[in-house]
Amino acid sequence: MGFIIGFLLSVFGYLLGSILFAKIVASYKGIDITSVGSKSAGATNVTRTLGKKYGALVFLLDAFKGFLIAILDRFYIDPSSLWFGIVMVSPVIGHIYSYRSDFKGGKGVATAFGVVFGISPLLALKMFLVWAFVFYLFRYVSLASITSVLVGYFLFLEGDFSTSQKLGATMIAFLILYKHKDNVFRLLRKEEHKFK
């Protein structure tokens, strides 16, 4: 029974994560978000292209995907089960590798934030504060996101979480950092665009 529930929640998480709200919101404005700006189907590109109001909407919708799956995960899956970690990762994988968009999508930050918020609101708050502080100092969204994810990840490892939850957090952190590799190189070359 545990296998069936874990499998079904993982599939549902991936399918839900694959709904790219950035594309949906931008399409209402007649824009293909994957062909403008960074071409990423995420909140940052929407903010740069359509403005803060639309960017905030996309962030909240993307975060809700992760939050909902995390709540279902906590309700149906034992935290010690390997399935807990798998379900945790599923909406982030769906968002980054959406089957609805040729297995391309966003970078997973908002969806991952939703997952963390669903598991530990306090940890999510700490991640947000780190993000806001770094962004305020340097005005780089990518640097703020990377720093927030790294700090959140190490806090997760030090926290009172199961091995499965920590494995899930490890996979999520790896995916997000991997998707930001080009940003890291641009930051090192001082070519990354600051957010005005």
From Swiss-Prot:
Domain of life: Bacteria
Organism listed in the record: Hydrogenobaculum sp. (strain Y04AAS1)
Top-level class of the enzyme under EC nomenclature: transferase
GO CC, any one term: plasma membrane
Pathway, per record: Lipid metabolism; phospholipid metabolism
Protein name: Glycerol-3-phosphate acyltransferase
Biological process (GO), any one: phospholipid biosynthetic process
UniProt key word Membrane: yes
Membrane topology: Multi-pass membrane protein
Its job: Catalyzes the transfer of an acyl group from acyl-phosphate (acyl-PO(4)) to glycerol-3-phosphate (G3P) to form lysophosphatidic acid (LPA). This enzyme utilizes acyl-phosphate as fatty acyl donor, but not acyl-CoA or acyl-ACP.
Keywords annotated in UniProt: Cell inner membrane, Cell membrane, Lipid biosynthesis, Lipid metabolism, Membrane, Phospholipid biosynthesis, Phospholipid metabolism, Transferase, Transmembrane, Transmembrane helix
Pfam families in UniProt: G3P_acyltransf (PF02660)
Compartment(s): Cell inner membrane
Record flagged with keyword Transcription regulation: no
SMART domains: G3P_acyltransf
Leader sequence residues: none
Residues that span the membrane, as ranges: 1-21, 53-73, 76-96, 115-135, 141-161
Quaternary structure (record): Probably interacts with PlsX.
Assigned protein family: Belongs to the PlsY family.
EC code: 2.3.1.275
Catalytic activity: an acyl phosphate + sn-glycerol 3-phosphate = a 1-acyl-sn-glycero-3-phosphate + phosphate
Gene Ontology molecular function: acyl-phosphate glycerol-3-phosphate acyltransferase activity
